Amino acid sequence: MMAAKIKKGDKVVVLAGRDKGRTGEVLQVLPKEERALVRGVNVVKRHQRQTAQSEGGIISKEAPIHLSNIAVADPKDGKPTRVGFEVLDDGRKVRVAKRSGERIDG
C-alpha cells in the first residue's frame, strides 16, 4: 500500500469542479473509493426521512470528492502543492510540500 499523501485534518484546495478554488479541511479519507470528505466543499442537499432522533426534511451535507480534484495547501502560502516524502535522521518519514520545501507534518 502506498503512503497517504492526503490525510484527515489536512487543509486542501479544490482543483476542479464547481467548488474550484475553495479550501477546506479533510474530515475523512475513503482510500478504497479514492475520495475524501472536505468541510464546506461539494455540499449536496439530501432528503432525510423523519426518525425518532432526527427531524425530517432537506438537509445539506458534504459529498465525497475525488482525490485527483484536490491538492494539499502549501503551509507557507496556502496555494495548492504536490506532496513528496522525506526521511529524517531519526528514521521518520514526513510529508513535504514540493512547492516550498516546507514540512506538512512532523
From Swiss-Prot:
Keywords: Ribonucleoprotein, Ribosomal protein, RNA-binding, rRNA-binding
Gene3D superfamilies referenced in this protein's UniProt entry, alphabetically: 2.30.30.30
Taxonomic superkingdom: Bacteria
CDD domains according to UniProt: KOW_RPL26 (cd06089)
One Gene Ontology CC term in the entry: ribosome
Listed GO biological process terms: translation
GO molecular function: rRNA binding; structural constituent of ribosome
Membrane-spanning ranges: none
SUPFAM superfamilies linked: Translation proteins SH3-like domain
Record-stated family: Belongs to the universal ribosomal protein uL24 family.
Assembly, per entry: Part of the 50S ribosomal subunit.
Role noted for this protein: One of two assembly initiator proteins, it binds directly to the 5'-end of the 23S rRNA, where it nucleates assembly of the 50S subunit. One of the proteins that surrounds the polypeptide exit tunnel on the outside of the subunit.
NCBIfam families noted in UniProt: rplX_bact
Protein name per UniProt: Large ribosomal subunit protein uL24
